[in-house]
Swiss-Prot record:
One of its GO terms (biological process) is regulation of signal transduction. Keywords: Disulfide bond, Glycoprotein, Immunoglobulin domain, Secreted, Signal. Glycans are attached at residue 162. Pfam families: I-set (PF07679), IGFBP (PF00219), Kazal_2 (PF07648). It is found in: Secreted. SMART domains: IB (SM00121), IG (SM00409), IGc2 (SM00408), KAZAL (SM00280). GO terms for molecular function: insulin-like growth factor binding. The keyword Cell inner membrane does not apply. The keyword Hydrolase does not apply. IGF-binding proteins prolong the half-life of IGFs and have been shown to either inhibit or stimulate the growth promoting effects of the IGFs in cell culture. They alter the interaction of IGFs with their cell surface receptors. This is Insulin-like growth factor-binding protein-like 1. CDD domains: KAZAL_FS.
Amino acid sequence: MPRSPGLFLLLLVLQPLPALGLGLRSAGGRNPECGPCRPERCPEPVRCPVPGIVARDECGCCALCLGAEGASCGGRAGARCGPGLVCASRAAGAAPEGTGLCVCAQRGSVCGSDGRSYPSVCALRLRARQAPRALPGHLHKARDGPCEFAPVVITPPQSVHNVTGAQVYLSCEVRAVPTPVVTWRKVTRSPEGTQVMEELPGDHTNIAVQVQGGPSDHEATAWVLINPLRKEDEGVYQCHSANAVGEAQSHGTVTVVDRSQYRAPRFPAPDDRL
């Protein structure tokens, strides 16, 4: 007796559906391969290089250290980066597993509410995690970019001593935000005895001034070159730097000796040794 088509469809509907391997997590959101959490079976707790950035493993059971900015990452067994960080490859092409570097997803330095500059907002957040939250005015980002500060002389000019006709120079290195304007001045005295600042190079044909940025960000290096050196060039030279926040100065001295005071050494003739 042939089966009725309606009966066949009814039997098909009543058949249990096979489990489909869709790789979905269970209703609880856990990895299907994870068993019951047993903390006693977790690896012994390790002291994380950077405390405060810890997460749970994929099963939500054992604690894992997260990589801070600049830490190695990537690979199957490599470290995971902390919040706000991404694992970037160190090489332009293909690189071995575990050779990535944790970098901040938001590039650029920031100014913190504590008046300090941080290389990235991730570095500021890490500092904020480590700072006591009970203190008033908890650390936060004040603005993008480094904090402003008045010029600071990093390398002051060194005093020089030379003879007339020689070539000498003085240099100084200054750091500030915004980047400072650096000038050279010669400290002189008026006939009345008051101090006078003479801007250089002025009318001096043997003096040149050069200023360039660097060697690091928000730094400036300035030189004053004297060639040829004359007796009237002797004196005190000031390296002056200024920006919208403040100013700073440092001094170097040039001492000049007349070349005519030095005589060429006379070596004894062969006959003089007899």
